[in-house]
């Protein structure tokens, strides 16, 4: 399973963006919300995004609700549209404070990484007060490479991988 581990980590690390699924307050209840954002990924498989509070999803992120992320192969790169490689992660959410100090995550270091990946637009975005940064820490996930090639991922280091299988005729 080391090969699968290496593949899914590489798949995350090369992604420029991620789909984000949140749950938001809506008419006294909740409603699902899906969006995307450019992202960076660190060596611990945490995903970071920089988004405006003007976006609907941001209120759910500020509330630090659990979130689902999906990294997915582009339609142009896939051989078969029904078999796009994808990585789905279930994550905790944390807003990154702009303050500095030992108890804070390194805002400046993350901004430097965003700038290296996406260019000067990041300097403009972080200068705007409505832009917030969030970290998604994976709890568990599923890596899907094709038919019969799905793998559950779990563990503190997200390194425990098992092939998903079921018997023919078995209901999922």
Question: Regions from the language model: what does each represent?
Answer:
Residues 14, 43-44, 64, 127-130, ...:
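Short, well-ordered loop/turn elements at secondary-structure boundaries
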Residues 25, 34-37, 58, 76-80, ...:
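Catalytic micro-motifs at enzyme active sites that drive phosphoryl/nucleotidyl and oxygen chemistry
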Residues 3, 105, 109-113, 119-172:
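C-terminal edge-of-domain segments
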Residues 1-62:
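An N-terminal domain-cap segment
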Residues 1, 14, 53, 92-99, ...:
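Domain-wide signal for the mature, well-folded portions of proteins, strongly enriched
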Residues 19, 34-38, 88-90, 131-135, ...:
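Conserved hydrophobic/aromatic beta-strand scaffold that supports enzyme active sites
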Residues 56-116:
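Short, structured beta-strand-loop surface elements
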């Amino acid at each position: 399973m080391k090969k699968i581990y290496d593949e899914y980590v590489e798949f995350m690390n090369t992604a420029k963006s991620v789909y984000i699924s949140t749950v938001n307050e809506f008419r006294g209840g909740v409603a699902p919300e899906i969006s995307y954002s450019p992202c960076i990924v660190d060596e611990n498989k945490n995903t970071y995004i920089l988004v405006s509070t003007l976006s609907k999803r941001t209120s759910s992120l500020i509330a630090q609700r659990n979130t689902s992320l999906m990294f997915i192969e582009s339609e142009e790169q896939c051989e078969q549209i029904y078999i796009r490689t994808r990585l789905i992660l279930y994550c905790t959410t944390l807003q990154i404070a702009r303050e500095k100090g030992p108890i804070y995550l390194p805002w400046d270091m993350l901004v430097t990484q965003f700038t290296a990946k996406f260019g000067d637009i990041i300097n403009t975005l972080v200068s705007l007060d409505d832009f917030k940064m969030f970290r998604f820490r994976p709890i568990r996930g599923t890596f899907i490479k094709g038919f019969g090639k799905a793998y559950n991922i779990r563990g503190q280091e997200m390194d425990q991988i098992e092939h998903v299988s079921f018997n023919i005729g078995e209901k999922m």
